[in-house]
Swiss-Prot record:
Keyword Flavoprotein: no
Higher taxonomy: Bacteria, Pseudomonadati, Chlamydiota, Chlamydiia, Chlamydiales
Function: This protein is involved in the repair of mismatches in DNA. It is required for dam-dependent methyl-directed DNA mismatch repair. May act as a 'molecular matchmaker', a protein that promotes the formation of a stable complex between two or more DNA-binding proteins in an ATP-dependent manner without itself being part of a final effector complex.
Family annotation (PANTHER family): DNA MISMATCH REPAIR PROTEIN MLH, PMS, MUTL, DNA MISMATCH REPAIR PROTEIN MLH1
GO biological process, one term: mismatch repair
Keyword DNA repair: yes
The name this protein goes by in its record: DNA mismatch repair protein MutL
Record organism: Chlamydia caviae (strain ATCC VR-813 / DSM 19441 / 03DC25 / GPIC)
Keywords associated with the record: DNA damage, DNA repair
UniProt GO cellular component terms: mismatch repair complex
InterPro entries in UniProt: DNA_mismatch_repair_CS, DNA_mismatch_repair_MutL, DNA_mismatch_S5_2-like, HATPase_C_sf, MutL/Mlh/PMS, MutL/Mlh/Pms-like, MutL_C, MutL_C_regsub
PROSITE patterns for this protein: DNA_MISMATCH_REPAIR_1 (PS00058)
GO molecular function: ATP binding; ATP hydrolysis activity; ATP-dependent DNA damage sensor activity; mismatched DNA binding
Family of this protein: Belongs to the DNA mismatch repair MutL/HexB family.
Length: 580
């Protein structure tokens, strides 16, 4: 029988490091907690500075009430808070934080410096390494607090290894701060990233100005104002017009009692109101602030406090549906411009390929069916090629791999029966055709896209978050034949693009990629850009690609690039299919 370690109490540092695993996921979590502390301290000017997406350095400076050296030492202890006194206070919160876990958790996994001064007292400087106070001394400062975080996760290297790229964190950081700009008015915000000023919002700037800054002038030009409710329930904000929509829900900002939340329930209710007004697979864009009685909201669901339980959810849902429906039903001026998503050339973006179209299309070692080199006209050579002849000798044998022989039996419409040492296989020729065509595009067009220069460069206006994506991937787009240059803070010029994609669909395609960029790191995004362009060619030119089943069998059976068993089964159907 194995021996068991005795039960013992964990030390404070270990407890805080474990808590940090829940509360502090990355540098964005650190900034979120420090900014919320600043707001709870009554600050109306908050400055944030980051390096390496926050992984190198984080500095949050505020003009709040400040702390004495004694308060600083107490704040570094777990569950020390000024926000609540008993559990019932959780259901009537007027502050952003309340657990008292964040500061000690951050201190336990970083090198921290706190410089603070209360309104009636002297300033102090406290240095903490891994949760232990190293130095505490008097230091003059104006009223307020500055917290600097260096070497995040330095003593938990496993956590550090799971961090995303600085670029990904930088984009997430921007969204976090944008949400604070929108949710808390009468507060000035400043963010310096990589030693460059990202933005400076003055505290006197109103809600509409802030929405225009975050969502872009294009959104505000046709935005619909929302303001309805009374003392019990109220919703204010802006809805995007039905002509302003996005391929994902990333353009949706929801706040409950000035707290940014991820609410599938609210998003669904609003999307239902738009359901008959948007193209398929498109989502409305909006900024909405919902105010509910504090006792109706339970934010104590997740350490990040982005989830919320609503006590009278059905009532709130009906209120939102009715309000959004009324706003959308108001008479609106009709735009004389046709939106990009309604252009006939873009309808393929709304059509979902069947799963069989891409089944088994990646990870294969099949040689290309035909060398695809764009001609001077920009067309592909197989567009004018006659299909291969269909007749074939019944006893034709084809190598299926390094040591297998495949013998053709017969064809049944779209299915070819072939036999090898394992038995009879039914090959679904349409899936195989798409498979081979896609692989040809991947291998032959990775660095060979025919481009055209625009007589007048296209102007693309983007949001600040989309700007970060574009400015970081200019070289990747250039390799694909898309020349992009930055003309202003949120304005880009597209000077050339592949011949097979139109001007308006090019803009939509780029913005769709920008929406996806928040989900992956930079390396994965580079691959996604290349794959997305390949799939665009795939959608546009697949119908013109023809191949006989004999040629198809020959391609699948090339011995120098043989399939293994798992790859074969992506393209062949088993005996159950034949019986049907």
């Amino acid at each position: 029988m194995s021996s068991r370690n005795p039960i013992q109490l964990l030390d404070t540092i270990t407890i805080n490091q474990i808590a940090a695993g829940e509360v502090i996921e990355n540098s964005i979590s650190v900034v979120k907690e420090l900014v919320e502390n600043a707001l709870d301290a009554g600050a109306d000017e908050i400055e944030v500075e980051t390096l390496g997406g926050g992984q190198g350095l984080i500095v949050v400076k505020d003009n709040g009430c400040g702390m004495s050296s004694e308060d600083v030492a107490l704040a570094l202890k777990r569950h020390a808070t000024s926000k609540i006194g008993e559990f019932s206070d959780v259901f009537s919160l007027s502050s952003f934080g309340f657990r008292g876990e964040a500061l000690p958790a951050i201190a336990s996994i970083s090198k921290m410096e706190i410089l603070s001064c209360p309104r009636a007292g002297e300033g102090s400087r406290t240095i903490i390494h891994g949760g232990e106070i190293v130095t505490s001394e008097a230091k003059p400062r104006q009223v307020g607090t500055t917290i600097s975080i260096d070497s995040l996760f330095y003593n938990v290297p496993v956590r550090r290894g799971f961090q995303k790229s600085p670029q990904t964190d930088r984009m997430a950081m921007r969204k976090l701060l944008e949400n604070r700009i929108l949710s808390v008015e009468n507060v000035g915000w400043s963010w310096v990233s990589e030693r460059q000023q990202e933005f400076h919002i003055f505290k006197h700037q109103g809600f509409a100005e802030r929405v225009a800054f975050v969502m872009g002038e294009g959104f505000m030009q046709e935005a619909l104002r929302v303001d309805k409710g009374g003392n019990l329930v109220r919703v204010v904000g802006f809805l995007g017009s039905p002509g302003f929509h996005r391929p994902t829900r990333l353009g949706q900002r929801v706040f409950i009692n000035d707290r940014p939340v991820d609410s599938t329930f609210i998003s669904k209710k609003i999307s239902e109101a738009y359901s008959m007004l948007l193209p398929p697979q498109r989502y409305p864009v909006f900024v909405l602030k919902l105010y509910l009685p504090p006792e109706w909201c339970d934010f104590n669901v997740h350490p990040q406090k982005t989830e919320v339980r609503i006590l009278r959810e059905e009532f709130v849902g009906e209120f939102l549906s009715e309000t959004i429906g009324e706003v959308l039903a108001r008479p609106q001026e009709v735009s004389v411009f046709e939106t990009a998503s309604t252009l006939p050339a873009l309808r393929f973006f709304d059509e979902q390929l069947p799963e069989s179209a891409l089944e088994g299309l990646q990870g294969s070692n099949v040689l290309p069916v035909v060398k695809l080199t764009p001609s001077s006209s920009g067309s592909l050579p197989f567009l004018d090629r006659e299909p291969d002849p269909l007749p074939v000798d019944r006893q034709t044998q084809i190598s299926w791999g390094a040591s297998q022989e495949v013998r053709f039996l017969t064809s049944l419409g779209k299915i070819v029966l072939a036999e090898d040492s394992e038995g009879v296989h039914a090959i679904f020729t349409e899936s195989a055709r798409k498979h081979l065509f896609y692989l040809s595009l991947v291998e032959n067009h990775q660095h060979n896209y025919k481009s055209q220069s625009f007589l007048v460069p296209l102007c693309l206006e983007v949001t600040p978050q989309e700007r970060i994506f574009l400015s970081s991937h200019i070289e990747e787009f250039k390799l694909l034949g898309i020349e992009i240059s930055q003309m202003g803070p949120c304005v880009f010029s597209i000077e050339s693009a592949p011949t097979f994609i139109g001007e308006e669909e090019l803009k939509l395609w780029i913005l769709s990629l920008a929406a996806e960029s928040a989900k992956v790191d930079k390396r994965a995004m580079t691959l996604l850009i290349k794959e997305a362009l390949t799939q665009t060619i795939f959608c546009k030119t697949l119908r013109a690609f023809d191949i006989s089943w004999l040629s198809l069998l020959w391609q699948l059976g090339k011995p120098e690039k043989a399939f293994d068993g798992s790859q074969i089964r992506r393209l062949v159907l088993d005996e159950d299919f034949i019986k049907e």
